[in-house]
């Protein structure tokens, strides 16, 4: 929906002035820019009439080459020619386990830099170079400055990867209106809200296999609203991986164990060409070094089957998440250049038992959707359709016992804000550590830590009296802000979650799949932890009370209370929930009597020196 803008008095722009907004598909293999002209989206060409900008940057001694001009250097100068930089965005050096020819510098737990002839370049800087090329292309083509841009990202990009994308856009001089999930952009491009039968809810699968990432989303269109019901994918699975599988096959055919960086670049280029040619041919020849190999369609299918199986597995899981059957899906939309492959189309057709939609160029569909959204956000369009993206993983914080309290569940539509009250655990507690985590498990140790901050200045109170309101807010770009505020004093603190690196493919898979596999185990373990926390709170309160009023008990009462206390402590060493609960009840038998004695003492102190007449006068 269009954002309303309020200008300063006397500074409002001319009525109905058209503002230039662009949509950018910042892809792993190729990038594009589009805009809406005369009500229709259009992909913008460069001066050579080319639409696709290869996402390649070559750093020479005195010159930097981009796109097609950088392509020849993939083989001639691979160490200084950066391709598929999107796969490095927001990821640590330790996370980057796939083969590449680059010299990476930096610590293991930080986003690395590439050592090039032009100096050290970070993935953010290189992405900014690509974005700047697209911005310049748009301004040259439209003969006007760009006022804003919508940039697409994979739905499975986490906070670190999204923030890295925003940083790159800022470095390129772009005003980012929004980061938009690529599958959502595809839905907009296909105008799925414009179909004739809109009386009933309609469900769509967006299958997006690009150069370096895979995403599948299930969208529902209902009463003018697009909602992403569920989403899943891999941050490191795409056409590049299909190329690598072909290279692996070729090495085996030629009995080659290790390739030099230069030879590897030759193999990758040949593999990519073969993959593309097999979309229209039954077989192709690969000229590799001094040998020639023939690759036919059945062999190609068997080579890439392991990757296709991964995508189909994700599709089935996302259907389960959305609580839908195959018969509930009206259309399947193919997005991403890799879906041109006949093998990919065949796999999708067989799983969903229908012909997928691929009438819009799969390389351009995301940029087209982004341009339509940008046109809406800048205020040029009156289209009232609403897009709701979702959080890919649950967000929560750590509570006593190392338990996770979820505030925002997985697949919640964004933007979203959730508030919940928490309290202190100990008497006189003046600070609280807020530990933010991401994942599907019930224990903090099984989730991913996103960040920590401390709320200071909590007034000293009895445990459980303080009221701390914690707010989780995820904006339309999927970026998270967590704030905490103490009610009586008004003290507050917050953190913007910008992790130093993103999730690896293995981490993403672990967080999701283990959540399903260990659901029952986690439920039982959570019950045990909660029972222990309550028992420990009882013991802590009793210890504090005994320090003050132990003289109220005679020797026999004190011995009985201490015996029950030690019995509970012994049970807390084990994991028998019923035994712990029984020990708590036995302790309460004695502690309740002690509490009654304490209450009487405090009432006596309060009434000491007070006459009956004083009560009569007060009433």
UniProtKB/Swiss-Prot annotation:
Pfam families: HSP70. InterPro entries: ATPase_NBD, Heat_shock_70_CS, HscA_NBD, HSP70_C_sf, HSP70_peptide-bd_sf, Hsp_70_fam, ISC_FeS_clus_asmbl_HscA. Keywords: ATP-binding, Chaperone, Nucleotide-binding, Stress response. One of its GO terms (biological process) is iron-sulfur cluster assembly. Signal peptide: none annotated. It comes from the Bacteria. One of its GO terms (molecular function) is unfolded protein binding. SUPFAM superfamilies: Actin-like ATPase domain, Heat shock protein 70kD (HSP70), C-terminal subdomain, Heat shock protein 70kD (HSP70), peptide-binding domain. Chaperone involved in the maturation of iron-sulfur cluster-containing proteins. Has a low intrinsic ATPase activity which is markedly stimulated by HscB. PANTHER family: HEAT SHOCK PROTEIN 70KDA (PTHR19375). Belongs to the heat shock protein 70 family. This is Chaperone protein HscA homolog. It comes from Acinetobacter baumannii (strain AYE).
């Amino acid at each position: 929906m269009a954002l309303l803008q309020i200008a300063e008095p006397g500074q409002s722009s001319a009525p109905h002035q058209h503002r230039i907004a662009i949509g950018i598909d910042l892809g792993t293999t190729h990038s594009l820019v589009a805009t809406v002209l005369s009500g229709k989206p259009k992909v913008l060409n460069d001066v050579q009439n080319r639409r696709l900008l290869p996402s390649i940057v070559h750093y020479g001694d005195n010159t930097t080459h981009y796109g097609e001009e950088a392509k020849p250097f993939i083989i001639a100068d691979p160490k200084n020619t950066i391709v598929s930089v999107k796969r490095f965005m927001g990821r640590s050096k330790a996370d980057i386990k796939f083969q590449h020819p680059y010299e990476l510098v930096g610590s293991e737990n930080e986003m690395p830099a590439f050592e090039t002839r032009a100096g050290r370049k970070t993935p953010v800087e290189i992405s900014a170079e690509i974005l700047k090329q697209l911005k310049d292309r748009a301004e040259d083509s439209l003969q006007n400055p760009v006022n804003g841009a919508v940039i697409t990202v994979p739905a499975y990009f986490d906070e670190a990867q999204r923030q890295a994308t925003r940083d790159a856009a800022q470095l390129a001089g772009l005003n980012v209106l929004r980061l938009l999930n690529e599958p959502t952009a595809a839905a907009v491009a296909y105008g799925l809200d414009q179909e004739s039968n809109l009386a009933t809810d309609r469900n769509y699968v967006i299958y997006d296999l690009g150069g370096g990432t895979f995403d599948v989303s299930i969208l529902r269109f209902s009463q003018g609203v697009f909602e992403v019901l569920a989403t899943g994918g891999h941050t490191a699975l795409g056409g590049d991986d299909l190329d690598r599988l072909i290279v692996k096959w070729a090495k085996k055919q030629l009995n080659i164990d290790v390739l030099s960086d230069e030879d590897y670049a030759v193999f990758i280029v040949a593999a990519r060409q073969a993959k593309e040619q097999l979309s229209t041919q039954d077989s192709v020849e690969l000229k590799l070094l001094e040998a020639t190999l023939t690759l036919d369609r059945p062999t190609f299918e068997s080579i890439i089957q392991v990757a296709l199986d991964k995508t189909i597995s994700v599709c089935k899981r996302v259907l389960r998440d959305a609580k839908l059957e195959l018969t509930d899906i009206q259309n399947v939309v193919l997005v991403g250049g890799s879906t041109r492959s006949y093998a990919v189309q065949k796999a999708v057709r067989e799983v969903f038992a229908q012909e997928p939609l691929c009438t819009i160029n799969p390389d351009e569909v995301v940029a087209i959707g982004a341009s339509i959204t940008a046109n809406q956000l800048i205020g040029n369009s009156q289209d009232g359709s609403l897009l709701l993206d979702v959080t890919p993983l649950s967000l929560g914080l750590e509570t006593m016992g190392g338990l996770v309290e979820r505030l925002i569940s997985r697949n919640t539509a964004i933007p979203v804000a959730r508030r919940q009250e928490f309290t202190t655990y100990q008497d006189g507690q003046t600070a609280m550590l807020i530990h933010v985590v991401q994942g599907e498990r019930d224990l903090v140790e099984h989730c991913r830590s996103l960040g920590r901050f401390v709320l200071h200045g909590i007034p000293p109170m009895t445990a459980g009296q303080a009221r701390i309101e914690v707010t989780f807010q995820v904006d339309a770009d999927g970026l998270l802000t967590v704030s905490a505020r103490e009610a009586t004093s008004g003290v507050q603190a917050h953190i913007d979650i910008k992790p130093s690196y993103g999730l690896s493919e293995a981490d993403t898979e672990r967080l999701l799949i283990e959540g399903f596999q260990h659901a029952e185990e986690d439920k039982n373990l959570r019950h045990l932890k909660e029972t222990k926390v309550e028992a420990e709170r009882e013991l802590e309160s009793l210890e504090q009370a005994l320090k003050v009023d132990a003289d109220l008990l005679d020797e026999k009462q004190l011995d009985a209370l201490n015996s029950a206390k030690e019995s509970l402590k012994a049970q807390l060493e084990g994991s028998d929930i019923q035994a712990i609960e029984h020990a708590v009840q036995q302790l309460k038998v004695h502690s309740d009597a002690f509490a009654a004695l304490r209450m009487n003492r405090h009432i006596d102190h309060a009434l000491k020196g007070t006459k009956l007449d004083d009560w009569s006068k007060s009433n």
